[in-house]
Amino acid sequence: MVSELLLELFSEEIPAFMQKNAEEGYLKIFTKIFEENEIFAKVQVFAGPRRITLHATHVPKVILPKEEEIKGPSIEAPEIAINGFCKAHNVSKLDLSTKLRNNKLYYFFVKKTKERETKEILPKIIIDAINKYSWTKSMFWGCYKIKWIRPLRNILCIFDGEILPLRFGHLSTNNITYGHRLTNNKKLEIIDFENYRNKLLENNVILERLKREEIIKVGLLELANAQNLNIKQDVCLIEEVTGLSEFPIVLLGKIPQKFLELPEEVIVSVMRTHQKYFCLFDKNGSFAPYFLFVINGRFVNTELIIQGNEKVLSARLADALYFYKNDIAKTLESRLDKLKSVIFHTKLGSLKEKVDRITDICRYIAPDNIDLIMAAKLCKSDLVSDMVGEFPDLQGIMGYYYAKHEELNEEVAKAIRDHYKPQGLNDNVPSGNATLLALADKLDSLVGLIIVGETPNGSGDPYALRRQALGIIRIIIENKLEINFINLISFSVSLYKVSSNSHLDSVISFFEERAKFYFKNDYDITLINAVLDLNLVDTKFKLDTLKEFLVQDVGKQLLNAYKRVSNIMGNQKITGLVDASLFSTQYEKELFEVIQKISQQIIVIIANKDYQKALNLLSSLLKPITSFFDNVLVNDSDPKIAQNRLSLLQNTCEVFDKVAKFCRL
């Protein structure tokens, strides 16, 4: 016989961004804990703004007894081990049997479980599962000792058509739930899951998150098409408004024409970030004076709701327009003094000091680039503008528009706009002068914060230094910047007027670790260790070349040849030079001649960055190395000859090391 379990945790508003994770998390937890208790049920979890619901079908009414054979210690084990096994399973030695396993006798114990009624064990299982899910943040409320994401108001729990009694803190289970908070907030008596879902729907609550999401997507598309407009895909915003609404309905509002003089990004920020509205665009991609929004519930007078949302948006845009007009009345340069009163970091001074360092770094990289140096000087000025003070996500973007209003060079304006890029792995790296400005800004922050001890550790990275380092690495590699990065780091460290050596080493070490992290998505770690240095463009080219070379037959054979040499050498460090007069075979002579021939050539080729040619030249060692080992005994009875042969092999390793650290492959 099987039954159905229905559990609803009814609470105050659950943050929208946590609902999807809670749905997935509780599904895993309940499925696992059921299986551990021999309850093999089909489990579903639904998350919404005010409820987390579990529905389990095919739940057995009775857990049948079973036998499990448990292996213990061997019969030859010390008595203390045997007694410990007995104590752990609450049995005596007389209850044990012996069986032969791998030609050895072991004690065994047959553990028998009793038949159990599922309803007797479910309360503990449910409480354990509720407590097991770890919310990103949770809270206590009142004088109760339970904690959850938001205060729980009710717990519905029905098993096999009856209330399953359990207590969670101060709450006892019942068969009651509630409809939509604004339109149908009344008690609903529930019989089973089908009755539960239908009654919620009748009272303006759609249980399934994915169904609510689909309703929103369809509504957005239909209203956009009705206006002959387009809507850009915004997965994150759709997920967010899905989590804000139990019964979503999409409506269309209009933006007054006077606000369209604002930069498009300002209107989008107000609408998307602050109001959770969707922007519309015409067929040419231009911003349209309309917006879409999602309301929570079915209301009679939607026209009044539209007017209310238009009024709220107009008020926000009026503020933005006021800020914008105030800001363009001042130049970016006139704001520099104000940066002196804004702290970048308590130990690293003001934003004005940071701007000065960024400018110095840009001047160091490109001393003749006037546009870059101007952009560096002005890149943080918009941070003290009214607009960015109100809408921080517009930093850089407003600097671009203010620079354009001042009729500054387009390159200066673009560099100011894009110097925060890339912001995350999915963001594009900047181009043009913004490339070097972004590099300088991120490098200054990273160097300064490492100097004052803010290096990330296992518990956190509050200043996102790992992300900034990856941003720098991507900027250099994707823009193929040929710069001496270690010298640049050294210069940046010197701007802080501190004892530089230890700090320089710390910064370099940090970048090396982040470079390994960056490259390991595409390359084996042994390959990375063989070629990594902070000439990042060079490293990328070496990795590509060596990766391709080592999958070829000649590459595999050459690596094996190197390992034969390396295995003989071990950790020995031979100090003597090779003495050709001590050669007693032609194979020693042939190997030595090839080494002498290619050694200097490889240095020149590597300097010219022709790594494929260097590997091809290195391959000329394959035949003489093979012949040497096939015909020569390294440990000759004459110690001088043996030592000379070791020196020859060391020379061989050194030639390989000019191309890559083959010992790490």
Swiss-Prot record:
Subunit structure: Tetramer of two alpha and two beta subunits.
GO biological process: arginyl-tRNA aminoacylation; glycyl-tRNA aminoacylation
Species this protein is from: Rickettsia prowazekii (strain Madrid E)
NCBIfam families in UniProt: glyS (TIGR00211)
GO molecular-function terms, A-Z: arginine-tRNA ligase activity; ATP binding; glycine-tRNA ligase activity
TM segment ranges: none
Subcellular location: Cytoplasm
EC primary class: ligase
Lineage: Bacteria, Pseudomonadati, Pseudomonadota, Alphaproteobacteria, Rickettsiales
EC number(s) per entry: 6.1.1.14
Superkingdom of the organism of origin: Bacteria
Keywords: Aminoacyl-tRNA synthetase, ATP-binding, Cytoplasm, Ligase, Nucleotide-binding, Protein biosynthesis
Cellular component aspect of the GO annotation: cytosol
Principal subcellular localization: cytoplasm
Keyword Protein biosynthesis tagged: yes
Family of this protein: Belongs to the class-II aminoacyl-tRNA synthetase family.
Stated name of the protein: Glycine--tRNA ligase beta subunit
Pfam families: DALR_1, tRNA_synt_2f
